[in-house]
Regions:
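A generic structural motif
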Residues: 80-81
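C-terminal segment of N-terminal export signals and the immediately downstream linker at the start
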Residues: 5-7, 26-73
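N-terminal secretory signal peptides and thylakoid transit peptides that target proteins
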Residues: 3-20
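Substrate-recognition/specificity elements adjacent to catalytic centers across diverse enzyme folds
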Residues: 77
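Mature-region segments of soluble proteins
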Residues: 2-5, 55-57, 66-73, 84-248
Length: 248
């Protein structure tokens, strides 16, 4: 992939957009995209989680198929596959994000989501009334609506690799015209969760097969090194990464 076709891996790993601007709205009414999605969920997707089976870790639990296509394209644009290491999609990041949103994190279990809501300062952090799962749903709807309006009627996942990069940079800069939430709010949480999934223990769905840890030389969840001290004294410590599941 050329530098002009997408966002380069080093751009992400250096932390583009890591300092998110505080965002806020002054209404607690459900955005149209969220209200529509909630009306279609009968029963709610979280009410009866699907039974786990052999390939349950590869199943989208929260995103609808169109939403999954968009989030997959977003992750692929943020961290494309190259000769340095696996891309975000190859590493399972879309599944990581989806499974996080399907659980307590998505519901905002540890977030204070009561009003009043007002425009905050950068130091005050997240100021929206939406938990992460709802923020993603509304953000994806706004993103695709903006792309359809400004990109010849195409959703984000239908754009070329180069056009996706341009759209994502506009999103990061807050230049994308969202109607329900601030564009930067969606970009900030997307980037944060993408990086978390890329470097997480594989037990959570991302960093598939420890490939990202191997790329950066991280040994994994090893609890002690006493038996290796003499073996590797004055030598480079090179071992295959071990995940939580590998050691359980």
């Amino acid at each position: 992939m050329s530098d002009h076709e997408g966002m380069r891996r080093r751009d992400v790993l250096k932390g583009i957009g890591m300092t998110g601007a505080a965002v806020g709205i002054v209404t607690t009414a459900a955005p149209p995209a969220l209200a529509e999605a909630q009306a279609q969920e009968a029963p709610h997707a979280h009410a009866h989680p699907p039974e786990r089976h052999a390939d349950a870790t590869e199943i989208f639990r929260y995103f609808t198929p169109p939403e999954a296509a968009t989030i997959t394209a977003l992750v692929d644009t943020l961290i494309p596959k190259d000769d340095v290491g696996p891309g975000g999609v190859e590493a399972g990041v879309p599944i990581f994000i989806d499974h996080e949103l399907a659980g307590a994190y998505g519901r905002g279990a540890r977030m204070f989501l009561n009003g009043p809501f007002a425009q905050g300062t950068p130091q005050q952090g997240y100021q929206l009334p939406l938990p992460p799962a709802d923020l993603y749903r509304v953000g994806i709807a706004d993103l695709n609506a903006w792309c359809v309006k400004t990109r010849d009627g195409k959703r984000f996942d239908q754009l070329s690799v180069a056009d996706r990069a341009v759209a994502l940079k506009a999103l990061e800069a807050g230049q994308a015209e969202f109607t329900q939430i601030p564009a930067r709010a969606f970009f900030n949480i997307l980037l944060k969760n993408t990086m978390e999934g890329y470097f997480a223990d594989p037990i959570y769905g991302g960093n598939r097969n420890n490939a990202v840890w191997a790329m950066i030389g991280f040994p994994g969840a090893i609890g002690m090194y006493e038996e290796d001290i003499e073996k590797y004294r004055n030598k480079q410590y090179v071992v295959a990464p071990k995940s939580i599941q590998d050691l359980s």
